[in-house]
A protein has these predicted regions:
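Catalytic machinery of carbohydrate-active enzymes
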Residues: 1-131
Length: 131
């Protein structure tokens, strides 16, 4: 998934987006999708404890299956997992929730590499979340 796939989120009003991305992939923040303003906090994330402190103060984490998604779930924070079509066994097919993290909601691809419909569903859910 690339930052450009998140373009539908730009239409959701009342949200502030914070990037928890570090390393070379964070360079995508230099050219975000039109209208999507993302705060880059990588310079303040020295270690995973810093990431945990930030996650603990966010209203919602939207992430692919990474350590950040698991961290948010373990901290009991609401997390929306953008899950690939052939997801790992731990996400259990046919479920939108997770037995591992009560605050996790899954948005799964309908086909391999298909993020468009996922992000449309996420944008709709985010509209409801902020209202």
């Amino acid at each position: 998934m690339r930052l450009t796939d998140m373009a539908p989120l730009a239409a959701v009003r009342g949200c502030s987006f914070v990037s928890l991305q570090v390393g070379p992939p964070a360079a995508q923040l230099n050219e975000p999708p039109a209208g999507l303003v993302v705060l880059d906090v990588a310079q303040w994330l020295g270690d995973f404890a810093d990431t945990a402190a930030l996650v603990a103060n966010l209203d919602l984490v939207i992430a692919v299956d990474t350590a950040v998604a698991h961290l948010a779930g373990a901290l009991g924070r609401p997390v929306w997992l953008l899950n690939r079509f052939d997801s790992c066994w731990r996400w259990l097919l046919g479920r939108d929730d997770s037995p591992w993290y009560p605050g996790l909601r899954q948005f799964r691809q309908s086909g391999q590499g298909e993020w468009g419909s996922v992000m449309q569903r996420v944008a709709g859910a985010l509209e409801e979340f902020v209202c």
